[in-house]
A protein has these predicted regions:
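Basic polyanion-binding and macromolecular-assembly surfaces
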Residues: 1-38, 42-373
Length: 373
């Protein structure tokens, strides 16, 4: 049976707009009959991918681009300066064609130099996969690849971010990578209450007697919410994608850190909503369980505030899951302030941030050792 690691967080943001829709307003969703502020899963994952650059080495990460031919060709030329850019592009294009990834020349504007062939969609490949492909092209030069040879390079030992968040190749489903992480849209635990920031700016070189109005004015919509965030990580799927137990441990360590610490950055120059979670619960289970239904009824703040009421509701939901379905976690850790501890101590073993990451890593290593017996 598969092993899952569930990540739960309650996090309060002051007035802000870190994830907006096409109308510029903070994203929202209906839940429990009320409108809630929302942070999309795509925005959360994008922030996490950016943070990985500070936690993992370049060769452990991937790039997502249509320009796979130009990117590979550049690495071919870097590996062997005697290869011309034209040759490198031709050989790179042929290699991707063998793999079943279609590339074509993009339409050039008038008087614009022709560009290298591109994929018709974003392709997510590991840096080390592109480096290995470039090295193989340098070795084979104009000798044709077989499909098996190319797939052995670009469809094995995937990068950490590719392994976590998955990959879809429109031309060939066999090249898809099943995501090891499922990420929920973060939602506010209480009803959304939009507000507006009307701002003006004055032209520094306009004299007061010449103009009394503003040089520019506008409005930014903002909201403040306590969010419930949830994601689940399939340990077995991640191991299959990475192909290495050591890479698995490093990936889980990095993901735990980035889930806790990262957020989208929309309008942060205007709002500086750089908060950290008020509560973190990480649980190891045999099947994923979200506690979002704790907030199906919008939380009303009491004299202790919204976060205390939301924490109590989440702990009650976790207890209900255990009582009704017998789905108690194998291990569970909790990060919470002393003020919340009495309400949430049933969620797991209280610990600190560094200790949680370390103990989670130890648990995964022990689980691997046990599975190998």
């Amino acid at each position: 049976m598969a092993t899952f690691i569930d990540f739960h967080a309650l996090q309060t943001l002051p007035p802000s707009n870190i994830n907006r829709g096409e109308d510029g307003a903070p994203k929202t969703a209906a839940f429990g009959g009320t409108r809630r502020q929302r942070i999309s899963s795509q925005a959360l994952k994008a922030a996490q991918r950016r943070d990985f650059a500070h936690m993992l080495n370049r060769d452990e990460l991937g790039v997502r681009t249509k320009q796979i031919v130009a990117e590979t060709a550049a690495r071919v030329c870097a590996a062997d300066p005697e290869v011309s850019p034209t040759e490198a592009e031709k050989w790179s294009s042929a290699a991707f064609g063998k793999a079943g990834i279609k590339v074509a020349k993009p339409k050039a504007k008038k008087d614009e130099e022709p560009k290298p062939e591109q994929a018709g969609y974003l392709v997510f490949l590991g840096n080390h996969q592109l480096d290995r492909l470039a090295a193989a092209i340098v070795e084979k030069r104009d000798q044709a690849f077989t499909k098996k040879e190319v797939l052995e390079i670009i469809d094995t030992e995937h990068a950490v971010d590719v392994s976590l968040f998955g990959r879809m190749i429109a031309d060939d489903a066999a090249l898809n990578v099943d995501a090891a992480v499922q990420t929920a849209h973060a939602i506010g635990v209480s009803e959304a209450a939009p507000d507006f920031d009307f701002y003006t700016a004055v032209d520094d070189f306009t004299k007061a007697e010449e103009e009394t109005g503003a040089g520019m004015m506008g409005t930014i919509e903002m909201m403040s919410s306590t969010f419930y965030r949830y994601a689940t990580l399939n340990v077995d799927q991640l191991l299959e994608n990475l192909g290495s137990e050591e890479a698995l441990v490093r990936a889980i360590d990095a993901y735990a850190r980035t889930f806790i610490l990262s957020l989208p950055t929309g309008y942060q120059n205007s709002f500086a909503a750089h908060t950290l979670p008020d509560l973190i619960n990480v649980a190891v289970r045999k099947r994923p369980v979200s506690y979002v239904n704790a907030f199906e009824k919008a939380v009303a703040p009491d004299e202790r505030g919204t976060i205390a009421a939301a924490s109590e509701a989440m702990a009650d939901e976790a207890s209900k899951v255990t009582e009704l379905y017998g789905l108690a976690p194998e291990r569970s850790w909790l990060i919470a302030s002393d003020a919340l501890e009495a309400d949430v101590d049933s969620l797991g073993q209280k610990t600190g941030f560094a200790e949680l990451v370390s103990q989670l890593e130890e648990h995964v290593r022990a689980q691997i050792t046990e599975d190998e017996r």
